Amino acid sequence: KFELQPPPYPMDALEPHMSSRTFEFHWGKHHRAYVDNLNKQIDGTELDGKTLEDIILVTYNKGAPLPAFNNAAQAWNHQFFWESMKPNGGGEPSGELLELINRDFGSYDAFVKEFKAAAATQFGSGWAWLAYKPEEKKLALVKTPNAENPLVLGYTPLLTIDVWEHAYYLDFQNRRPDYISIFMEKLVSWEAVSSRLKAATA
């Protein structure tokens, strides 16, 4: 059975940028429901005992998702999202990550502009991602609807922002662009992104 993992920091650690009340609902209710429902869906099936990543790839079913896909992908996406943030985050990346951003987007500022635009223009519910394309050895921005993520495209996710309304509504109401800016300026963990890139390029 999959277990709901806590975020890698206390629930109030991202205040005032992301409130403990948002965590109460977003992690405590939404994320928990994805994990609980997934466990019910796979119990006693051939998916029981597989990793979350394997379940996502199998149930994506080449774009015709099977019933367990949404809960599996959302369970994975949320854990990845919590780990994409840290208290006193933001700032700029460094090292190989910054070099690749400069190479593939022209500059860090250009990347931020594109990432914010991808997150702001994802219609309805979904996610915006920085991903690594292993075949081309390049970074790419991806926006995905609902539960989808770059794993199903064969890419390695490096960073994500959740743009489902439940991610920001208690703190920002309908001001999605403000939430996205705060995420980039105050919350993103470039250390986490760098370590994911290192693993992807090893």
Curated annotation (Swiss-Prot):
Record's cofactor remark: Binds 1 Fe cation per subunit.
Enzyme kind, highest EC tier: oxidoreductase
Residues bound to Fe cation: H26, H78, D162, H166
Cofactor: Fe cation
Expression triggers: By environmental conditions.
Top-rank lineage group of the source organism: Eukaryota
Pfam family, one: Sod_Fe_N
EC number(s) recorded for this UniProt protein: 1.15.1.1
Catalytic activity line of the entry: 2 superoxide + 2 H(+) = H2O2 + O2
GO MF annotations, alphabetized: metal ion binding; superoxide dismutase activity
GO cellular component, one term: chloroplast nucleoid
Subcellular location as annotated: Plastid, Chloroplast
Keywords for this protein: Chloroplast, Iron, Metal-binding, Oxidoreductase, Plastid
Family statement drawn from the similarity comment of this UniProt entry: Belongs to the iron/manganese superoxide dismutase family.
Subunit structure, as described in the record: Homodimer.
Biological role: Destroys superoxide anion radicals which are normally produced within the cells and which are toxic to biological systems.
Protein name: Superoxide dismutase [Fe], chloroplastic
